[in-house]
Amino acid sequence: MCIRDRLLAEPVADWWWFWRNNDFEDATNIHAFDISDSNSTLYLGSGRVSGTVQDQFSMSEFQGSIRIASTSDAWGRWWLDGELDEFGEPIFTGPSNQVTILHHEGENCLISPCNSLIQVGIVENIAPNETIWSARFIGDRGYLVTFENIDPLWVIDLSNPFNPVILGELEVPGVSTYIHPVDENTLLTIGIGPGEDGLGLDWSTTQISLFDVSDPTNPTLADSMPISPAYTDDDCDDIRTCGWAWSWSEATYEHKAFTYWAPADLLAIPLSTYRYVYDSESLNYHYEYISMLKLINVDIENLSLSSHGEVDHSDFYDNEDNWWYSSTSIRRSIFMGDYIYAFSSSGVTVNSLSDMTQSDELLIPGQSTPSWYYEEQETTEEQSDESDESSEEGYEADEPCPEGPEGETCRD
């Protein structure tokens, strides 16, 4: 993760601790680099924190403090439940979460070795038995979303790196998988909607939420909005009973698909779904696919969410012969002036933000199996046939032809 003139790096998934570490303690190594000089990179030091890190938003550097949000025992080694270590303590107690603050020791090597990142503060035992689903650090505050059956939003005061404390907590149904700061007092999130009775998750529902954190000791859910790309038939009141499969949005796990445009207070989210339907005219069943970009008004003044419109790429499926293994779903979007551009593997559309009418489109050739895959096989068979014919005539394919020019072979 790059933060101004600092680069924080963590190793990719490492399974050594999971299978061979007898201490049963998962940990993440953190490496810091100074990249303020464009001509060189300076290694600052390394440190270690307990647990594993969710993503780049779980790491931050602010005024010399490196803040890391992590979950310990995230993999839940349930088969060790009830077993004790050599000291009689339980080996597995369930996952736990923490925010650790590191400082670069620099030239002061009295406490620890030079080039080390030492722990100066920590908040431990945040939401026992839950795991971190999203995190964000903004100035001297940290925000965490943990989940087991319900989604608590945690607000952490990091103004004193030596004594970080939890300021507030809010339990809301569902879970947020990405936190986007609109301003210092407002958070915009995307995630999965709640299941029945507000517990668990309904993976068929993508949910947008708006949080008011102006009072960090009492964060509130200002508004939430479930969104779906499916439409309701005339004879169906609930899209979940009309045969639609779970809808999904790449923005729930890839922040690059989450497009918020502050000048217009607009949010763009791609969504897709499908269903298996019966065509009474052709007397056949077929798949019906939907790919849309949902636009949402984010009213910061009144702290509310509302639908602005949508961009539909569903027709691109009709032009895609290989939709079953390619991606016609909208992947990215960008606001430019008074227009919204939507991108999928099959095309690009341009829509007016004023009335959402389409002003232009560009079709992109779909993916297809390389033609040489079959041609190579056919060529090999043809060469094999030629070799057989040459052998029958009593000469090898690489030998000169009986009546050919000097140096020419039969294969030529």
Task: Please report, for each region that a protein language model flagged, where it lies by residue.
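Feature marking well-ordered beta-strand scaffolds used for ligand recognition
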Residues: 4-412
